[in-house]
Amino acid sequence: MKKLFILLFCFLPLTIFAQNQLNGYVYEANEEQKENPLPGANLVWLNTTVGTSTEFDGSFSLPLSKTSNQLVISYVGFKTDTIKVNSSKTIKHWLEPTTSLDEVVLDSKVKSTSRSYIQSENIQYVSSDELLKAACCNLSESFETNPSIDVNFSDAVTGTKQIKMLGLSSPYILIATENIPSVRGASQAYGLSFIPGTWVESIQITKGAGSVVNGYESISGQINAELQKPFTDDKLFVNAYAASNERLELNTHFNTKVSKNISTGVYLHGNTHQEEHDRNDDGFLDMPKFNQINVMNRWQYTNTQKGIVTFLNLKYLDDYKQSGQIDFDPDTDKLTTNNWGSEIDTKRYEISGKFGYVNSDLPWQSLGIQMALSNHQQDSYFGLNEYNIEHTSVYSNVIYNSIISDTRHKIKTGVNFTYDNYDEFALNTNYDRVERSFGGFFEYSFDNLKKFNLTAGLRFDTHNLLGEFITPRFHLRYSPWSKSAFRASFGRGKRSANIFTENQNLFASSRQFSILNNNGPIYGLDPEIAWNYGVSYLQGFNLFGRKADVTFDFYRTDFKNQVVVDLENAQAVSFYNLQGSSYANSFQVEVNYEAFNNFDLRTAYKYYDVKTDYQTGKLSKPLTPKHRFFANAEYKTELKNQSQWKFDATFNWLGEQRFSSTIDNPIQYQLNKFTPTVATLNMQVTKVFSSKFEVYLGGENITNVKQDNPIVSANAPFGTAFDTNFVYGPIFGSMYYTGLRYKLN
């Protein structure tokens, strides 16, 4: 009865009254009339203070005015339009750039990354233009030009890149594809590399706890990747890539319009690397050999008259990696001491869909349904350690949106269900389990766009292993003056720690694994619970007549329980429940400045204080730099006859990082307490020949920084000191690449 009461509470506001509303979309004008959204565009009724701004997809909703039918639409860098509105029918409007000449056309100043001055959540929007600044082969490589996300290699063998936000690794981040959780469970370690960069239309990065609509698991933040839409993507898109390390990649998109309302697309991705590189002469491959085939068939149904939008996605992935010693032959050396080697063979099937409905008679009401079914199977071994996992997952979410009296008072409510079946083999033991959760949520938003808004959410979940629990989330925004936004947030997160799949890199070592069983529900351990608190201030201003903005962020995560991964014994790893305190403090200041026409500069400084009580005392988290400096410069020539040059450069400096203790190793395998500082420079030049064709040439780590001896005891891989997890910088050195992009509209 208690569960039923709480769930029914989430639906109390469903029956409401509202005044007539105007819904619509604002897009960037283009020759093909593509629906390229303008997030943050302002709309206001002429001679009134009633207005709103567009969401990230360009959509808006605002009450009809009794005193004016003239709607003023404006956006920085675009002409301001005033249109007449005589009914509540959904409208679409394309804004023109402010400068448009016959022979010379300046790029419209839609920033490749942007933050809203009016949203309560601290969200950064990353467009596809930002992803083109580097060779964004997959989602794990999409953050090289973004200071909010840290990208590091997890070990010296698999070549896997791991991301961090607010000082915490990716398991504490909710990573979603079109707001459906996609990198979780068995895909946590390598899932980012399973989303090709060309498939991504835009990314939204949310710092802090996020929304209750998306579940209870996020702790440090949320990353959502929006995929290309068959209705708006090019009919044909080809991206070919080749690198000096002999990595090859090909991406192709085929989109076609089946009928007036239906479009479909086939997206193909393949990459391969079969060469052997050992630049540091330690007898191990500097990067793995690999092959990946990735296919997606995407269907879109859009009927604006009926207010219906539907997506259906069918995906298949086959990914294979081989790493280890140069002389390793999997046919003869697998799981033997002949030569140390590793193979990771992953196959993944996925079907997902979204259904959206907007009531044409009551346009402030909408219903959304999200569903996903996936099967992920990984067979792998690392030296003598065998690890296999099969994860079948079902996800569903139903969301109802409406308002209370007017669009200043918005609500979201709904229910979701998650099912996870894990069949896991590690350390010669089967670890099988089933997780089921059912929950309801309610979220209220108050929008007084000029000065203040807030979002308060609450969800209740019942879980077969984690029990019953409530998750609160809260965000507010206050703008004391023009072009300013002060934000504050807090929220609670709870999750199951998948200790093996999230720490697969530790299998590439000779460490002995131990779980200090506390009779918890998962691996004998308790669920992880944390509170996240944060404040942020964004201020826009003019400097020497040029636009600029500065952002200050401070966030703190306090763990009430954490599954501690203790590496302080160099020949062992222990997993146990937190005894004491664990926290992560993150401070960041970021400045964006248009130094002169078509030249944008982004700089950032970040400070981390991440500490945990281990069995040996309170220590900072290994391989987490306290200080980081970031700079990105972008220059574009003027667009003339659809042709231009683009230049991008990104500099990263990482301060010293603590190594976990190696004092238990023989003296020749002991490391210093701290790493050296690391500085890397990436650059790319793009030549746009026309709207259809462009080529690019770039380099990563062009200063050729290399970590010496990244593998401990590489000469004795089956000895007690062998470990590949002390990586703090590049291993391969400099790498250069070239590629081309071809589009057919």
Predicted regions located by residue number:
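Short acidic/polar hinge/loop motifs at secondary-structure boundaries
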Residues: F60-P63, Q162, I180-K207, V295
